[in-house]
Structures are given as structure tokens and as C-alpha cells.
């Protein structure tokens, strides 16, 4: 993928929840302009339909519009929260495939990222979201530095986390919020797990729900052909005493599997996180807790 350059036009879309006005994205907008980009607002960016930024078809139209415009070099989601999975039947996946460009977002936006990767073989950047990352006055240095790496098409070699099971592997890298991922189960948009290295995280979930979602993941087609699992941060996830611990959930999930695995990788709903290319080719060394992005 070609690196982005100063002067490039970028689309701003809201495929999930409503924005709530220009003030909510102004700091993020200023940051993107400081990088030299020229933001272009999607036609329905400020629309409102219930909790979402317009109807399903309106939000899908904005995605299709962004990928259809040759002058647009990247597509930035401005908010997540909920709703992206609803637009997936209305995306023109062949259009996206013929006009590849990075989609950048986080959290609920991963539903769209996973669908585009599955249906259009595209690469998205997961981990940056203007409304989320500029709740404070400044962007976290790790988010900013890793985003700049992707913008410049620089290689990523990350040491993070702790080992749960040793091993080395290569595969296609995917990353998602666990709840968002499992909402796609049983749909045409759930990823083909064969040959994949999967990073998952979550926030504000009860431990018994984390446990059940992990077991649901374990029952998906081709799970046994997964190459590796990386657990990111599970922020503010708690439970009752009988629920056990998060490590108990991980241990039950890993039972009767043999792929390499690490936990506490710097990705999730915390101020500091890496921005990572979903769909890239990667090497994973659990012995050294190293994720190396080979190409994207």
C-alpha cells in the first residue's frame, strides 16, 4: 500500500453512532489537518437516526462514496460505539475491492473492517478514533507514533505483553473487539480463521460473558486452523466470585489448542495502544512477545 502524503484528501465518515456536532470531532480534525491532510466530510456525516449517524443505507452510502472517489486516499471513521454491523449488507464490496485504500477506526468500526477484509481483501488500520482519542487535549504518544508509522508505510515490530504459550508462526493479522467480532458469527462477514493471527480485546463486559464469547469463538468454522491468539486489554471487565478470573477464561479457551498465545498486548480501550493494520501479513513470536508486520 502506498504511503499517504501531505496534501492528500481523506474522507471522514461515521459508520456507527451519531457524532453530536462538529465540536466532538474538532480536535481530531485539527490533528489530521496538522498532518497535512485535507479532510472531506461524507454527505451524511451529521445525520441522526436513533443512536446512529443516519439510517443504515445512508451510512453505507457514505462508505461507498468514500471508496468511489479517486481523489480520496484514506477513509477515517470519526466515531464508533455501535451500529456498524447494520450497514454491512449495503456495502458495495466489489467497488471497495477495485479502489483499495485504508479505512481507519476503532472498536465498533472493526465490524466494517472485518467485512471489508473478508469480502474485498482490504487492509484497515485499527486503533485510532478522533472522538475517542481526543477526549483529552492531547493524543497519546503511542497512538500517534504508531499511526504515523502506518501513514509513512514504515515497518512495525512490536514487543508487548506476556507469554501464555510459546511458539512462532506467520499468518494474516486480524484485530477486533471481541464483542464486535462475535456479533458477526453466523453472518457472511465473519472472518475465515484459516491462517490467521487474531488479536482481541474488550471493555465493560462481565467475565462470564467474556468466557462465553471465547467459547463461541472456539466453536467457529476453521478455528483449529488459527495460527495464533493475542489477548489485548480487557478494560473494566469484572465478575462475581464464581465467574473466576480473566486468566481462568483464557485457560479454558486455550484448553485443547496448540497455537502460540500472549496476553496484555498494548491494544484495547486504554489511552495507550498501537494502531495496527488489520489484514496485513505478520510474524508472531510468542516466546519473545513479538508481533512483526511484514507487509500491508
Residue ranges and their predicted role:
Residues 1-71:
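ATP/NTP phosphate-donor binding region
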Residues 41-43, 105, 226-233, 262:
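Short internal beta-strands
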Residues 69-74, 225-226:
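Short acidic/histidine-rich motifs immediately flanking catalytic phosphotransfer sites
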Residues 74-85:
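N-terminal glycine-rich "phosphate-gripper" loop used for MgATP/nucleotide binding
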Residues 91-115, 123-129, 257-261:
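Short, acidic/small-residue loops that bind anionic groups at enzyme active sites
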Residues 121-186:
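Conserved anion/nucleotide-ligand pocket segment
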Residues 192-241, 245-246:
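Internal helical hairpin/lid segments
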Residues 237-296:
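ATP/nucleoside-binding phosphotransfer catalytic cores, i.e., glycine-rich phosphate-binding loops
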Amino acid at each position: 500500500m502506498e504511503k499517504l502524503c501531505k496534501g492528500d484528501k481523506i474522507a471522514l465518515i461515521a459508520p456507527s453512532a451519531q457524532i453530536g456536532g462538529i465540536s466532538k470531532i474538532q480536535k481530531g480534525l485539527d490533528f489530521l489537518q496538522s498532518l497535512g491532510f485535507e479532510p472531506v466530510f461524507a454527505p451524511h456525516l451529521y445525520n441522526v437516526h436513533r443512536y446512529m449517524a443516519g439510517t443504515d443505507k445512508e451510512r453505507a452510502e457514505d462508505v461507498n462514496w468514500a471508496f468511489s472517489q479517486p481523489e480520496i486516499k484514506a477513509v477515517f471513521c470519526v466515531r464508533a460505539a455501535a451500529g456498524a454491523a447494520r450497514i454491512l449488507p449495503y456495502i458495495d464490496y466489489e467497488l471497495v475491492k477495485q479502489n483499495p485504500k485504508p479505512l481507519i477506526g476503532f472498536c465498533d468500526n472493526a465490524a466494517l473492517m472485518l467485512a471489508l477484509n473478508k469480502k474485498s481483501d482490504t487492509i484497515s488500520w485499527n486503533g485510532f478514533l478522533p472522538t475517542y482519542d481526543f477526549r483529552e487535549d492531547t493524543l497519546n504518544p503511542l497512538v500517534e507514533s504508531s499511526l504515523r508509522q502506518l501513514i509513512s508505510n514504515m515497518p512495525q515490530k512490536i514487543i508487548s505483553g506476556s507469554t501464555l504459550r510459546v511458539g512462532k508462526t506467520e499468518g494474516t493479522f486480524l484485530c477486533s473487539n471481541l464483542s464486535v467480532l462475535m456479533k458477526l458469527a453466523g453472518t457472511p462477514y465473519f472472518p475465515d480463521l484459516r491462517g490467521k493471527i487474531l488479536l482481541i480485546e474488550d471493555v465493560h463486559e462481565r467475565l462470564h460473558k467474556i468466557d462465553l464469547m471465547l467459547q463461541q469463538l472456539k466453536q467457529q468454522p476453521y478455528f483449529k486452523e488459527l495460527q495464533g491468539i493475542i489477548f489485548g486489554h480487557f478494560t473494566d471487565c469484572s465478575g462475581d466470585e464464581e465467574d473466576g478470573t480473566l486468566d481462568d477464561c483464557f485457560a479454558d479457551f486455550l484448553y485443547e489448542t496448540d497455537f502460540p498465545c500472549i496476553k496484555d498486548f498494548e491494544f484495547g480501550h486504554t489511552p495507550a495502544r498501537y494502531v495496527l493494520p488489520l489484514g496485513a501479513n505478520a510474524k508472531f513470536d510468542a516466546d519473545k512477545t513479538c508481533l512483526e508486520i511484514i507487509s500491508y
